[in-house]
């Protein structure tokens, strides 16, 4: 049997009121667990999200029949701004330490959010975390999600940097793939 694989899930949420986003997280965890069993390779999951909630984490484990020791919710909201990172150095160091443990990251951006239409704070926060992952040299897979629109040219350039540095990029729909093809050479799966 191979060593345990540690997968970081970014933009996949457990502690969220949007049940569609939580369902997306459940779906990917369920698929990864099937792959884990087929390959006889145990997987530990670090779910990087805004805030952690141990009760919701336990409920997801129970629902998916996954051991609680396999899924850890790791808060990331403090990584959204430099000022927050400075104000919370211990929390920041703990999060970065957990990020470095990951063999690979899969980013879902909650399925439909790799865009700046939800505001600059949210775009910068999520995108900065992706850039940090890539800067650490950890493979980043952009899972099925929508891309764009980007209302600001600087945001489109920042997104392009993430997309082109990613190990693998998947679009949720043809429209998103075509949108990104207008500003990036990266090919989708």
At which residue positions do the language-model features occur?
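Aromatic- and Gly/Pro-rich donor/ligand-binding loops
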Residues: 2-150
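Active-site-proximal region of nucleotide-activated glycan assembly enzymes
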Residues: 123-127, 131-189
């Amino acid at each position: 049997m191979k060593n345990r694989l540690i997968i970081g899930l970014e933009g996949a949420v457990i502690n969220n009121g949007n049940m569609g986003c939580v369902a997306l997280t459940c779906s990917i965890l369920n698929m990864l667990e099937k792959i884990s069993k087929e390959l006889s390779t145990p997987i530990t999951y670090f779910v990087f999200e805004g805030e952690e909630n141990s009760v919701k984490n336990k409920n997801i484990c129970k629902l998916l029949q996954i051991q609680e020791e396999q899924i850890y919710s790791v808060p990331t909201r403090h990584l959204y701004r430099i000022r927050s990172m400075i104000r919370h150095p211990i929390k920041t160091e703990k999060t970065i330490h957990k990020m470095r443990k990951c063999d690979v990251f899969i980013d879902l951006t909650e399925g439909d959010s790799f865009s700046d239409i939800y505001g600059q704070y949210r775009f910068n926060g999520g995108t900065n975390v992706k850039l940090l992952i890539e800067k650490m040299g950890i493979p980043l897979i952009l899972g099925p999600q929508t891309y764009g629109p980007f209302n600001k040219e600087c945001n489109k350039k920042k997104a392009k940097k993430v997309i082109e540095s990613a190990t693998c990029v998947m679009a949720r729909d043809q429209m998103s793939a075509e949108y990104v093809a207008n500003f990036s050479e990266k090919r989708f799966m």
